[in-house]
């Protein structure tokens, strides 16, 4: 089957966790998957350990470090050359969370790294692909059946960035708050590390980046009719035992899944979360 007969979904961050567990249900649904990761080697090794040999034939690996905007531009050029006109879905899943940092890490362009990866990289990726995404044919073939399909963008979300949710009001270290965006307005380069221009708080930097994701989805919904593009910010439930939390204290990694399973009842397995992402 040539690319002209295939329909592609792009997903970032598939070396572990929710992203890795989204691959199989996507392939089962008839999709070809463009897996975007910082390391193709890690992504391939993870996929080999998770998928059948037959399923692996439907994965197309593209190496992009989302923290480097130049790499995003180069990677998108490759994606458009190889799969342009056949991309139907973008799933922004990759994220970094380093709540124990004392000082901000910086991206290649000098931006605070969690904002660079979680928001800037994905924002640029979407913007460079959106014209191709929304101009594609609405009739696609999945599992040898022709179906009408509306292109879509899905960004993985979190309740900790939503002040309307209890999890978004917990003041540890502080709720998400972009203020008047003075940090962005003033260039967001050292010594600036927060969107609101205030003192660096690593946990809040993550929340702020995810709030920016939510705003991006809302803006896409304003700019494109639902017949042209469906945009979603998706919270799958609390997947409390993924590598997203690898930089938290060990006691947190031990207790947090138990708390979500038996107290809040919000716990969701990586497999179920992946299936939910594939459905959207």
Residue spans for each PLM region:
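Rossmann-fold NAD(P)H-dependent dehydrogenase/reductase core
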Residues: 2-240
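A glycine/serine/threonine-rich, flexible loop-to-helix segment
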Residues: 169-171, 240-261
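C-terminal helical subdomain
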Residues: 257-280
């Amino acid at each position: 089957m040539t690319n002209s007969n295939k329909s592609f979904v792009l997903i970032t961050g598939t070396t572990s966790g929710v992203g890795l567990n989204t691959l199989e249900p996507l392939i089962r649904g008839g999709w070809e998957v463009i897996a975007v990761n910082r390391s193709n080697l890690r992504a391939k090794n993870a996929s080999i350990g998770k998928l059948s040999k037959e399923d692996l034939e439907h994965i197309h690996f593209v190496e992009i470090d989302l923290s480097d905007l130049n790499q995003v531009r180069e990677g998108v050029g490759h994606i458009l050359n190889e799969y342009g006109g056949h991309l139907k879905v973008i799933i922004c899943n990759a994220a970094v969370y380093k709540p124990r940092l004392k000082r901000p890490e910086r991206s290649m362009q000098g931006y605070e790294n969690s904002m660079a990866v979680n928001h800037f990289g994905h924002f640029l990726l979407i913007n460079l692909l959106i014209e191709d995404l929304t101009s594609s044919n609405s009739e696609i073939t999945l599992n040898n059946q022709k179906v009408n399909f509306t292109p879509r963008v899905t960004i993985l979300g979190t309740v900790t960035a939503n002040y309307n949710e209890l999890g978004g009001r917990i003041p540890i270290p502080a709720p998400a708050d972009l203020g008047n965006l003075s940090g962005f307005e003033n260039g967001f380069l050292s010594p600036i590390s927060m969107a609101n221009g205030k003192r660096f708080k690593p946990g809040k930097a993550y929340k702020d980046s995810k709030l920016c994701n939510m705003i991006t989805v809302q803006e896409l919904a304003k700019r494109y009719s639902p017949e042209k593009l469906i945009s979603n910010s998706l919270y799958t439930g609390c997947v409390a035992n993924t590598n997203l939390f690898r930089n938290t204290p060990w006691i947190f990694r031990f207790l947090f899944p138990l708390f979500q399973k038996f107290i809040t009842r919000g716990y969701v397995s990586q497999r179920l979360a992946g299936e939910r992402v594939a459905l959207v």
